Regions:
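Conserved ABC ATPase "signature" region
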Residues: 63-67, 109-126, 177-181
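Helix-to-loop junction immediately C-terminal to a conserved catalytic motif
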Residues: 48
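Conserved ABC ATPase signature
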Residues: 130-134, 138
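ABC ATPase NBD coupling module
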Residues: 64-80, 104
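ABC-type ATPase nucleotide-binding domains, specifically the catalytic core motifs of the NBD
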Residues: 12, 92-112, 120, 210
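Hydrophobic anchor residue at the start of the ABC signature
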Residues: 144
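A short, proline-enriched helix->beta-strand linker immediately N-terminal to the Walker B motif
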Residues: 149-153
Length: 217
């Protein structure tokens, strides 16, 4: 479960999020729709523990995760996240990026996961490459697959389908929804595309609209 209580965040004195509260149960999906600069990415970074709030609290599974001046580190939150600009490990191959953090899993599970994601996201021919050898769209698909690989309890997706071609975008969208059906994480999916948001709502997601001042519309 993800719970936000009166969450606020400013940059250089400019409010980005103001007193935002929401609760997302395990297995629930929330699509956050709004224009650039309304706080969508900031919301994800606060949930992930990459930033701390100026006011309010973030709780995960009933446990305090963030408040002003203190927060659990990202690795302690069971969160997978994929941002618009994928942060892949440049010195690791694609397959090593996918399996990073799966040290406790059996070899058979790791192999099965890599094969499943490679087939779903059209990565089979890229597994031996390094991030510097990937196009922007390829890197984005690897970043999305890596977010899913650990089957985290919470999944944060920041416009992961941006700049993908129409047919590939539709297939990756469907494959992502199919994959998460297998482990039912709480999902926050950020987009500025009303069509993308509508498709997610049709697949059972709730909708949160953010205005430019970071309040729920």
């Amino acid at each position: 479960m993800i719970r936000l209580e009166n969450l606020s965040k400013s940059y250089s004195g400019k409010p980005v999020l103001q007193e935002l509260s929401l609760e997302l149960a395990e297995g629930a999906r929330l699509v956050v729709l709004g224009p650039s600069g309304c706080g969508k990415t900031t919301l994800l970074r606060l949930v992930a523990g990459l930033e701390l709030p100026d006011a309010g609290r973030v709780s995960l599974d009933g446990r305090l995760a963030s408040q002003p001046g203190w927060g659990l580190p990202p690795y302690a939150r069971s969160i997978g996240f994929a941002f618009q600009s994928p942060t892949l490990w440049p010195h690791l191959s694609v397959v090593r990026n996918l399996t990073f953090g799966m040290n406790g899993a059996s070899k058979s599970h790791v192999k099965e996961t890599v094969e499943e994601l490679a087939n779903a996201f059209d990565l089979t021919g890229l597994l031996g490459r390094y991030p510097g050898q990937l196009s922007g769209g390829e890197a984005r698909r690897v970043g999305l697959a890596r977010a899913l690989a650990m089957r985290p309890r919470r999944l944060l997706l920041d416009e992961p389908l941006t700049n993908l071609d129409g047919e590939l975008k539709e297939r990756i969208f469907k494959e992502t929804l199919a994959f998460i059906e297998g482990f039912h994480p709480a999902v926050i999916f950020v987009t500025h595309d009303p069509g993308e948001a509508a498709a997610l709502v049709e697949n059972g997601a709730s909708l949160l609209r953010l205005e430019n001042i970071g309040r729920a519309a």
